[in-house]
Amino acid sequence: MCDMGGLDNLIANTAYLQARKSSEGDAKELQKRRKSLSLPPPDVSRNEVKETITLDYQSICVEQPIGQRLFKDFLATVPEYKLAEDFLEEVKEWELEEGSAKEQLMEKLVSRRFKEPAEGSLNFLGKDLSSRIQQAQSKDMPELILLAKDSGNAFLMDAPFQDFQNSPFYDRFLQWKAFERQPINQKYFYEFRILGKGGFGEVCAIQVKNTGQMYACKKLDKKRLKKKNGEKMALLEKEILEKVHSPFIVSLAYAYETKTHLCLVMSLMNGGDLKFHIYNVGDKGVEIKRVIFYSAQICCGILHLHSLKIVYRDMKPENVLLDDHGNCRLSDLGLAVKVKEGKAITQRAGTNGYMAPEILTDEDYSYPVDWFAMGCSIFEMIAAYTPFRDPKEKTSKEELKRKTLEDEVVFPLPTFTEEAKDICRLFLAKKPQNRLGSRTNDDDPRKHAFFKSINFQRLEAGMVDPPFVPDPSVVYAKDISDIADFSEVKGIEFDDKDAKLFKRFSTGAVPISWQKEIIDTGLFDELNDPSREVTGGGNSGEKSGVCSIL
């Protein structure tokens, strides 16, 4: 007999893998669509968005990819400004280098920029700093280069930024901002196979029609949200995701609504979650060099959340996803919460086996709970079970709580290195004030010997090769037949209060993620080409003040 479930899964996987491949190059349909696109006229853009933009240098010229690109293009037109920008790029290259190569780069930088005859005058340094640099010994030079870097950045924030705002490059930035703000709905995407399900809906793979970019779409059922009082939680997750911009946390690209769902469009992580790799790929557990690499990236992600006054509350391998290259990101911020000044967190949240003692005893808690869960996750990556469960038989909820509160962690496997044992013990301290990451205000887990092989500056710059690269021909997700269907929710009606919340949720494209997509897929260069011709069609019937870009 024909296995229809297996056939459905094969068809879904084939379409999904084909879409992933096609996103790497322009198919005929994609080319046709892109030829119909054009930026709105400068006068329209200026009138629409100029008054709504905060003239903040960091936001426009550093954080927003299109703003950064256009600002660099502007700097290239003024020799003095270009000199400052080139110098800062050289300093950045020096900061990220290692060992003897770093020493050589410093010598080259000093010789080129500070010794007579220098290649252009760095006027922004000022007489005092210039004099100190000229008289400095080699051992003092790194500190002085960083001071020169600060002076260079301060210079670009002043006259160059003001001049940029009066240039055609800024007008072009406003055109892109107008494009960015057009309404988004489900017609802008192709939808592919379901990747998983959660408490309020499903996650499926989608593709932006006019760029080919692949994403994961978390579709939250409106009726199910209302029935379970989850509407505010969905809005909070969306608002937190908007604030987060880290290579170690999934990025939110779009937020929109359909008649039945609230949709969060986020980074598509094709490599599967760490739980899958621990239990389903090869021998159980993950080799130690991968554990160190993933743990380093996870630490960076958690520290980024904490810097924004956000407690994650659901750190576990299942919520850590791998991308095509083998880098990992934190996902599912549905339980994340913003810490309010002077207000304690008391609500119990998390997953059994990863919850800290202070959550289990219903005490006030804060950031240290994430570090406890981090310790559980490192242990699980190595041992293929969590530290307070019995690996050979099922542990009851009550026994798990007792062990978490009373038992010290033990390491029965030889795969635990001494550094791994130590970092687990420190993360799993019963009292939050004794826990690694929380002992003092500047207690940084990245300084632990467990991470001695990691250069975190290079890691954060994406310059460290992952120790494992997922197979691009494999779908790291359950068969669609294994993903249970939801039953229909009946008897739920929406009112004006619901409509207002849905509207707050549905804000369209998220600037940084959207701009990165436009640059990465080549659409930025294509639409900025002055010789480019625009043809009609390719808009799928959407009506907008400008041609649809998404």
From Swiss-Prot:
BP GO terms, sorted: regulation of signal transduction; signal transduction; visual perception
A GO molecular function held by the record: rhodopsin kinase activity
Positions where Cysteine methyl ester occurs in the chain: C547
Record PTM text: Autophosphorylated in vitro at Ser-487. Phosphorylation at Ser-36 is regulated by light and activated by cAMP.
Chain sites annotated for binding ATP: L195, G196, K197, G198, G199, F200, G201, E202, V203, K218
Proregion positions: 548-550
Annotated Protein kinase domain residues: 189-451
Membrane topology reported for the UniProt record: Lipid-anchor
InterPro entries assigned: AGC-kinase_C (IPR000961), GPCR_kinase (IPR000239), Kinase-like_dom_sf (IPR011009), Prot_kinase_dom (IPR000719), Protein_kinase_ATP_BS (IPR017441), RGS (IPR016137), RGS_sf (IPR036305), RGS_subdomain_2 (IPR044926)
Keyword entries, A-Z: ATP-binding, Kinase, Lipoprotein, Membrane, Methylation, Nucleotide-binding, Phosphoprotein, Prenylation, Sensory transduction, Serine/threonine-protein kinase, Transferase, Vision
A matching Pfam family: RGS
Gene3D superfamilies, per the entry: Phosphorylase Kinase, domain 1 (3.30.200.20), Regulator of G-protein Signalling 4, domain 2 (1.10.167.10), Transferase(Phosphotransferase) domain 1 (1.10.510.10)
Residues covered by region (Disordered): 22-45, 531-550
Lipid tethering residues (S-geranylgeranyl cysteine): C547
CDD domains according to UniProt: STKc_GRK7 (cd05607)
Active site: D314 (proton acceptor)
Keyword Kinase: yes
Annotated localization: Membrane
Function: Retina-specific kinase involved in the shutoff of the photoresponse and adaptation to changing light conditions via cone opsin phosphorylation, including rhodopsin (RHO).
Entry similarity comment: Belongs to the protein kinase superfamily. AGC Ser/Thr protein kinase family. GPRK subfamily.
Protein name per UniProt: Rhodopsin kinase grk7-b
Gene expressing this chain: grk7-b
